[in-house]
Every structure is written in C-alpha cells, then in structure tokens.
Curated annotation (Swiss-Prot):
Assembly notes: The glycine cleavage system is composed of four proteins: P, T, L and H.
Gene label: gcvT
Functional note: The glycine cleavage system catalyzes the degradation of glycine.
Record protein name field: Aminomethyltransferase
Any GO BP annotation: glycine decarboxylation via glycine cleavage system
Reaction equation(s) it catalyzes: N(6)-[(R)-S(8)-aminomethyldihydrolipoyl]-L-lysyl-[protein] + (6S)-5,6,7,8-tetrahydrofolate = N(6)-[(R)-dihydrolipoyl]-L-lysyl-[protein] + (6R)-5,10-methylene-5,6,7,8-tetrahydrofolate + NH4(+)
Keywords: Aminotransferase, Transferase
C-alpha cells in the first residue's frame, strides 16, 4: 500500500488528483497542471516534497567519508550552510543517485536524496560509512515543502519571526540555515528562486495552511516535471541511472577531478570514459505542431555523413515557451539540427544546450 505524507489530507482538500509515485500517494495536479506551471513562473507555488529522504551524517571523519562517496568534492564546502549538487556513483561510474549535500559543521553534513532510490541509497551510504565511523540518521521526523517562484521568498518571509528573517537575510543560492524549527534552503527544482523548507512533521499542516493564506498556490508533480524540464534539470531514472555516466548526462561539471590524488568511488571508470568519450545530453526544440515524448528516437548525420540515432529521455510541451522541448541522449558529433520520428512522421528539431528557461525568461535559443 502506498505511503502518505503528512499533507495528504491537505492535498485532497485542495482538490488534488492523487497518484502513486514510487510508493507514495502524491498530487499530480490540483485541477490544471498548466496553470500551476505558470503560477510558479510568474508568482509563487508550493510543492509537497516530503517523500524525499533527508539523511544526517555525524562524525569526526564525515568530510573524509563524503570525499570518497561523492563525485563532487565537499572540500569546496568551507562556509557552514553551503551546499553542492553531486552524483553518488558505483564502481563502473554509473549514477546511483543525484543529491544535494549541506555542510553544517565539521562533524555534521546533511544529504537530501530521491524517493525512488531511498532503499538502495541508504544501504550504499551505511555500507560505506562504517569504516569511517560515521553515524547515519534518516530524518523521517521531518517534512519538506518547496516554495518556488519570483515572489516565493517574499511570501515565505511573512510567516517568519524577525529572528528567522534575520538568519536568512542575504542568503545566496545553495545555502541552508537552521532557523528555530525550520531548515530553510535556497535550493529548488524549477529554475526559479525560492526555498526548500524542512520542518517537524507535526508542524507542516499548519505551515502549509499559512502558505495558502499568504497567497501561495499548491502545485503538483505534473508542473514540477515541466518546470524542471524547462530549466534543463535531470530526473533520476530518465536522464541518468546506474548504467549512465554523469559525463553522458550533462553532469560533468559535478565531477571534481582535482586534486588528482582524491580517490572517489567510480573515479577510475570515469577517467577511462573521459579519455574514450561518451554520449552527450542535449536539448531539443520543435516549434512545429506536435509533442516530443520520452523514448522517441533522434536521428542525425555527423560531419562525415555517418548516420546516428539517439533517444529522448524527457520530452513535453513547454507552457512557458508555447512549443515542445526535450532532453535527449545522443552519440557525440551532433550538429544544430536533427530529426525525431513521431509515429510515421519525421519532424525537424533544433539542437541546443540543455536549459530552455531561466528565472521565468526564455534562454537565448
């Protein structure tokens, strides 16, 4: 039987269409996915993301442990509260999960991992933490709410005490601060400004109702997916998984190659992949009528006239742009144009970098 977050009854009261999402009953939408998408781009929307897993790591050797566990390097995190995005890899360089890691104290780091990968993530982390004597605590006592959009931070501020407002004043992106019983982070999955707020489960219903009263509208999984796609953000299980290298998923920037003597899980395999070359993740734009869908084939010719085939990993109509966009994994050598097979039609598409909308505005496409 699917699990429920503490906000389940609130979603039902708001008219949500509930669906089973990796074993959790979650809101797909509250009436109109497109309206919810536009609200986040133009005003402020909120998402229940309590199905995600928060993991606290304690111990004197926690930093050393994470430098081995993760492809990005937590040595970069020197200011308490600073966070970074990273992959956790297997020995063959495949992505076990993508996650955010926060540096809170020298002996205290926090991870936020995906819901679909919860069990394998926890098993992997616990297994590798043991030699470092790091305590792994799963924070199932916390709920998580993302408030996103150009007015999100302003609307959240109306619910905070003066002390909490002072604690987060001037906070830059990718930071997290504990302010009383709220852990407030300037992170998100929409390409908009906003917060992801962790708080005790018993407080989250009241907090949700306060956000509603402040004019923040609820948004579901459907809008969350089109927002992250417009922002060019990966979804685990589509853009990457245990058989896909971060180098083939537009995540090369999350791999810290220096210092050369840092050994992290998957490094040897990644170095070989870097030397040999990998597939790449690109953006696709189709302004003609039709919708680019997951798993459709992408055909193109390289400069030598050789034919290649890739595949769409995520595709959808873009509510912000008014036409169809996609992310696709393709062999190296793709130019600016390709063709996607939609039923029995060959549709021309333009190839771009992943990322189509930033802060509510179209990227120069």
């Amino acid at each position: 039987m699917a699990k429920q977050t503490p906000l389940y009854d609130q979603h039902v009261a708001c008219g949500a269409r509930m669906v089973d999402f990796h074993g959790w009953m979650m809101p797909l939408h509250y009436g109109s996915q497109i309206d919810e998408h536009h609200i986040v781009r133009q005003d402020a929307g909120m998402f229940d993301v309590s199905h995600m897993t928060i993991v606290d790591l304690h111990g004197a050797r926690t930093r050393e442990f994470l430098r081995y566990l993760l492809a990005n390097d937590v040595a970069k995190l020197t200011q308490p509260g600073k966070a970074l995005y990273t992959a956790m890899l297997n020995a063959s360089g495949g992505v076990i999960d993508d996650l955010i890691v926060y540096f809170l104290r020298e002996d205290y780091f926090r991870l936020v991992v995906n819901s679909a990968t919860r069990e394998k993530d926890l098993n992997w982390i616990i297994q590798h933490a043991e030699p470092y004597q790091v305590d792994v605590t799963v924070r199932d006592d916390l709920a998580l709410v993302a408030v996103q959009g150009p007015t999100a931070q302003q609307k959240v501020a109306t619910l905070l005490t003066s002390e909490q407002q002072q604690a987060i004043a001037g906070m830059k992106p990718f930071f997290g601060i504990q302010a009383d019983d709220l852990f407030i982070a300037t992170t998100g999955y929409t390409g908009e400004a906003g917060y992801e707020i962790a708080l005790p489960k018993e407080r989250v219903v009241e907090f949700w109702q306060q956000l509603l009263a402040a004019g923040v509208k609820p948004a579901g999984l459907g809008a969350r997916d089109t927002l992250r796609l417009e922002a060019g953000m990966n979804l685990y299980g589509q853009e990457m998984d245990e058989g896909v290298s971060p180098l083939a998923a537009n995540m090369g920037w999350t791999v810290a190659w220096l210092p050369e003597d840092r050994q992290f899980i998957g490094r040897e395999a990644l170095e070989q992949q870097r030397a040999n070359g990998t597939e790449q993740l690109v953006g696709l734009i189709m302004t003609e009528k039709g919708v680019l869908r997951n798993e459709l084939p992408v055909h193109f010719s390289d400069d030598s006239g050789n034919q290649h085939v890739g595949v769409i990993t995520s595709g959808s109509f873009s509510p912000t742009l008014g036409f169809s966009i996609a992310l696709a994994r393709v062999p190296a050598g793709i130019g600016e144009n390709a063709v996607v097979q939609i039923r029995n039609r060959e549709m021309p598409v333009r190839v771009t970098k992943p990322g189509f909308v930033r802060a509510g505005k179209p990227v120069a496409l």
